[in-house]
Amino acid sequence: RVEKRKPFDFSDLKSIIFGSAGMVLILIFVVHFCQTGLQGITGLYVVDKFGFSTKQVGVIWMALAGILIVVQGFLTGPLAKKIGEKRLILIGMFCKALVAFAMVLTTGFVSVLVVFGLFAVSSAITVPTLNATLSKTDNQHKGTLMGFASTAGNLSKVIAPLLTGYLYESNIELPYITTGGIALIGVVICYIWIKNQKNK
């Protein structure tokens, strides 16, 4: 027997946006914004600031991909079970803020590699965990929520390059400071979300 789903009612939109699912959607926007902003500007940043060669930039992206594969494939699931999905998201958001501010303090190839390694870890633990959390939030409107999540992610991928590119023209370090501030807002939102869930 196939269970019929309740058709989406726009009166439910308010409860979704202002409920737990709404918090997750905001976090998805913030996470994708930070990732797109950092990834899009770093190639230019390391060339302009340090004069990195194409080979050095390639090594950074290769290391990023390798760490992402290892952490997401082998560590994210066990960590989520051990400390909880919400706490793992909070840690990942904090790491994103740390990465953004730390990039301003980098002094060369090794420090950039270390900072971007942390960026890879934060990406590997936040994105899949957020998606998993969203899928458990509201079974009745799961398809609608996934659509909202996709929209939030895509919107951030449009806004982030435009904003960071504009800021980069004024000061090459300003995109990192701005992204770090946005990531800290994400940390606060995540903390409030966790506290609200505990109080229920």
Please report, for each region that a protein language model flagged, where it lies by residue.
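A membrane-interface helix-boundary motif in multi-pass transporters
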Residues: T164-A183
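Helix-to-loop junctions at the C-terminal end of transmembrane segments
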Residues: V71-E85, Y168
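C-terminal transmembrane helical hairpin of 12-TM major facilitator-type secondary transporters
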Residues: E85-L130
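Short amphipathic helix-loop junctions that connect adjacent transmembrane helices
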Residues: G40-V57
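A late C-terminal transmembrane helix in Major Facilitator Superfamily
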Residues: H141-E169
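Paired intracellular helix-loop junctions of major facilitator superfamily
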Residues: L134-K142
